């Protein structure tokens, strides 16, 4: 592969842009399609892009230095994708990647898969071979037989831009997905002869935005009647309801209705609210409140295994009437069968529903929630030491954004961690279930929310997937805390092998000295062996301008019974 050009974009605001435009007029230089793309992205409200420049994408970078877009250079395209994911989850706005063709795109497919599984808006812009070379198989640099077909498996749609004139409407299609459909990655590839073509004539005029769908009037009326008649209603909210937090609270309080959340909906109700069940529908006590309900209203959830059957207890089958609301009509026909299926955005539905309801109901909501919460400490998979650990994090850094990987503490966080607000907790253990997510995703979240403390929680095995991205964080001046939960290899997999009567193989991996490695990458680092030393390290991390790695040995903080976290 040819050497990549390492460019650093400097965001110097409108003044820099004005100077650049003046020079262009004086020289009479054309504006390439790559430059015009940057201008259009800025007009769409994009302020950050993640990518590694390469020979096939230099035209995207021609316009960056004079724009209002900040460019962040990861150390691997997988890091770019996970940074974009973290940025998007923290804000609700699409994270944007610039990728070279071939290996640049394939390196980002895992983040795209994770984002697709969790409905995270992401715009992936890549190069591709020139139009006359597409599908020829002649051995051109970075060539794939059908790059778009590969990307289409991990995106809402993948499009090859055949003419510069199509750029505004193709971008409009992408943002229509983000604004009005179930979000996820959108991939746009630009052939090399198109990205360099003249786009000077294209106006920076956005297409009208597309509003999300609202419910049919008859469906809203029927839902209101069913909810009004119920005496033990329960609401289940997924990631599709996060943007409707105010409406969720209003409806829950009007109907005196307990609210059960999935991982992606943590924090939608304020923690400690009398109607917030918290925990997880994978836990027995929470399942019971659903089974005891005489009506369930489900908003923006797929009823997927990693939220509703993480402990492999068997499928949850609701026997009561079920109202399902989803922005994706296909989801209404998956997993749980609804009594009433409503194709609508959750917020639009709740706003239509509220005036149809009568006066405040009395359905013993707080009492039912208290019963669930009282039962949680007796659950086989509840761990008091993890509860102490999570409470320490929140006390040290109030309002933190906690970004988890597929690692032991995040599994317990599914049912024991309560986020302070929407978009303040997310992890990769659901959906795609990838490793190496937390470090780059936390960097993306911090870039999106610079005034909020951000903590990555990752295992010693997972950390080795993307540890190099700490160098990108140090270069960008991103002050996150990274807790490396060290349990000496792939501990959960080892326990699973032992439980299945398999001699463990491939799980006892050697780890570097994480403290020294972090310092070598330009970060700060410490080891925490007690709750107080962890608290101090977290506080110290907030006064720096680089990531702080905090290594924690599992045995210093918790003890586990033999057999693995998911075994009784």
Where in this protein do the model-derived segments appear?
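Short hydrophobic beta-strand segments
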Residues: 48-49, 234-236, 401-405, 460
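Active-site diphosphate/adenylate-binding microenvironment
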Residues: 34-37, 44, 52-55, 60-65, ...
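Conserved short loop/turn motifs at secondary-structure junctions
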Residues: 237-243, 378, 459-461
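Phosphate/pyrophosphate-binding active-site segments
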Residues: 25-28, 165, 203, 319-406, ...
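N-terminal amphipathic/basic-hydrophobic helices that include classical n-h-c signal peptides
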Residues: 1-25
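Basic phosphate/pyrophosphate-binding loop/patch that engages nucleotide-derived ligands
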Residues: 180, 397-398, 474-479
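N-terminal alpha/beta PP-like core and its mobile active-site loop of ThDP/TPP-dependent enzymes
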Residues: 21-357, 479-482, 517-518
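Thiamine diphosphate
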Residues: 133, 137-142, 287-290, 333-335, ...
């Amino acid at each position: 592969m040819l050497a990549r050009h390492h460019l650093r974009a400097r965001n110097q605001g409108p003044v820099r842009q004005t100077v650049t435009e003046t020079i262009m007029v004086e020289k009479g230089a054309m504006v390439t399609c790559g430059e015009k793309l940057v201008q259009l992205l800025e007009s769409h409200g994009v302020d950050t892009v993640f990518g590694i420049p390469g020979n096939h994408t230099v035209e995207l970078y021609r316009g960056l230095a004079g724009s209002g877009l900040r460019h962040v250079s990861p150390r691997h395209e997988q890091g770019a994708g996970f940074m974009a994911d973290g940025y998007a989850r923290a804000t609700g706005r699409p994270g944007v990647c610039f990728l070279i063709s071939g290996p640049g795109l394939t390196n980002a497919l895992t983040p795209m898969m994770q984002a697709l599984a969790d409905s995270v808006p992401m715009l992936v812009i890549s190069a591709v071979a020139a139009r006359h070379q597409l599908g020829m198989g002649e051995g051109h640099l970075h060539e794939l037989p059908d790059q778009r077909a590969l990307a289409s498996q991990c995106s809402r749609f993948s499009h090859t831009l055949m003419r510069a004139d199509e750029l505004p409407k193709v971008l409009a299609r992408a943002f229509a997905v983000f604004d009005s459909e179930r979000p996820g990655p959108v991939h746009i590839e630009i052939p090399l002869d198109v990205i360099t073509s003249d786009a000077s004539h294209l106006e920076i005029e956005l297409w009208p935005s597309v509003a999300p769908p609202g419910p049919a009037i008859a469906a809203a009326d029927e839902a209101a009647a069913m909810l009004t008649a119920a005496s033990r209603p329960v609401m289940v909210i997924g990631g599709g309801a996060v943007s409707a937090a105010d409406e969720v609270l209003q409806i829950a309080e009007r109907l005196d209705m307990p609210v059960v959340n999935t991982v992606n909906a943590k924090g939608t109700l304020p923690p400690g609210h009398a109607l917030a069940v918290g925990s997880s529908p994978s836990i027995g006590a929470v399942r019971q409140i659903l089974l005891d309900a005489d009506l369930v209203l489900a908003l923006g959830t797929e009823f997927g295994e990693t939220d509703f059957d993480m402990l492999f207890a068997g499928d949850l089958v609701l026997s009561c009437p079920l109202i399902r609301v989803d922005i994706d009509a296909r989801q209404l026909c998956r997993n749980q069968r609804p009594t009433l299926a409503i194709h609508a955005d959750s917020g639009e539905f709740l706003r239509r529903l509220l005036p149809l309801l009568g006066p405040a109901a009395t359905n013993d909501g707080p009492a039912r929630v208290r019963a669930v919460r009282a039962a949680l400490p007796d659950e086989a998979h509840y761990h008091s030491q993890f509860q102490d650990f999570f409470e320490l994090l929140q006390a040290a850094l109030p309002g933190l954004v906690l970004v988890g990987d597929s690692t032991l503490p995040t599994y317990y966080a599914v049912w024991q961690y309560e986020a302070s607000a929407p978009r303040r907790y997310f992890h990769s253990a659901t959906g795609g279930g990838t490793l190496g997510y937390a470090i780059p995703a936390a960097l993306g979240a911090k870039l999106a929310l610079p005034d909020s403390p951000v903590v990555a929680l990752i295992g010693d095995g997972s950390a080795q997937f993307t540890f190099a991205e700490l160098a990108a964080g140090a270069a960008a001046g991103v002050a996150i805390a990274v807790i490396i939960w060290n349990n000496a290899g792939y501990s959960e997999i080892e326990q699973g092998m032992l439980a299945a009567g398999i001699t463990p193989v491939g799980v006892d991996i050697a780890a570097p000295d994480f403290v020294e490695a972090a310092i070598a990458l330009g970060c700060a680092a410490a080891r925490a062996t007690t709750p107080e030393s962890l608290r101090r390290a977290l506080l110290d991390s907030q006064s720096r301008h680089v990531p702080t790695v905090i290594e924690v040995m599992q045995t210093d903080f918790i003890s586990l019974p033999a057999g693995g976290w998911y075994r009784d």
